[in-house]
Amino acid sequence: MNFTKLFAIVLLAALVLLGQTEAGGLKKLGKKLEGAGKRVFKASEKALPVVVGIKAIGK
């Protein structure tokens, strides 16, 4: 009957609507990873000259 066509349309609509919700969670995770990467980069920028200076003194 037409039940299979109706079921397919409802299923497709649900996938489209619920698929957008999933992207929000992945976006939040991406932002957290990006923030962690920035913090590590800034910390290494501060620490690297100190490490190079200690290594130069030890020569």
Swiss-Prot record:
PANTHER family: CECROPIN-A1-RELATED (PTHR38329:SF1)
Domain of life of the organism encoding this protein: Eukaryota
Subcellular compartments: Secreted
One cellular component (GO) term of this entry: extracellular space
Keywords per UniProt: Antibiotic, Antimicrobial, Immunity, Innate immunity, Secreted, Signal
Organism in which the protein naturally occurs: Aedes aegypti (Yellowfever mosquito)
Example of a GO biological process term: defense response to Gram-negative bacterium
Organ and tissue specificity: Salivary gland (at protein level).
Family under the similarity heading: Belongs to the cecropin family.
Signal peptide: 1-23
Protein name as it appears in the record: Aedesin
